[in-house]
Regions:
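HIT superfamily nucleotide-processing domains
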Residues: 1-125
Length: 125
C-alpha cells in the first residue's frame, strides 16, 4: 500500500505544495511546529532516508536546500532548521522549520487552522 506521502504526490490527497521537480516534492506539514514548516520528500517511495542511494540522497538534500532558501526569504525567521525523524510516516522526508529560537523545533504543538494554511501557502508561493 502506498504511503500517505506517495498518495499526496499522486494527487489522491490534497496538499499545500511549496515546490516540485521531477524527483522531489515539498509541501506544508499538516501539523506544523511553526508557520511555514515544510516537508521535503523524494517522489520515489523509500521508508528510511539512509536507504536512498547516494545520488537520490544528495538530490533530496540539494532540493531541500533550495526550498529552505525560499522559506528563509519568505518567512520571518532567523534560520531554517532541518531535521529528519522518520518514524511517523514510512516515506523518507526532511522537516524544514522556520526558526526564531531553538525551542521552535518543539514537535508537540497545536494544529493550524485551514485559513492559516491557505495564507501561508499563498505567501510561500
Amino acid at each position: 500500500m502506498a504511503s500517505i506521502f506517495s498518495r499526496i504526490v499522486a494527487g489522491e490527497i490534497p496538499s499545500y505544495k511549496i515546490a516540485e521537480d521531477e524527483h522531489y516534492y515539498a509541501f506544508l506539514d499538516i501539523n506544523p511546529v511553526a508557520p511555514g514548516h515544510t516537508l521535503v520528500i523524494p517522489k520515489h517511495e523509500v521508508d528510511y532516508i539512509f536507504d536512498l542511494d547516494d545520488e537520490e540522497y544528495a538530490g533530496l538534500m540539494a532540493f531541500a536546500k533550495r526550498v529552505a532558501a525560499a522559506i528563509k526569504e519568505a518567512m520571518p525567521c532567523v534560520k531554517v532548521g532541518v531535521t529528519v525523524l522518520g518514524l511517523e510516516v514510512p516515506h523518507a522526508h526532511v522537516h524544514l522549520v522556520p526558526l526564531q529560537k531553538e525551542t521552535d523545533m518543539n514537535f508537540f504543538r497545536q494544529k493550524l487552522t485551514l485559513p492559516a494554511f491557505v495564507r501561508i501557502a499563498l505567501y510561500l508561493n
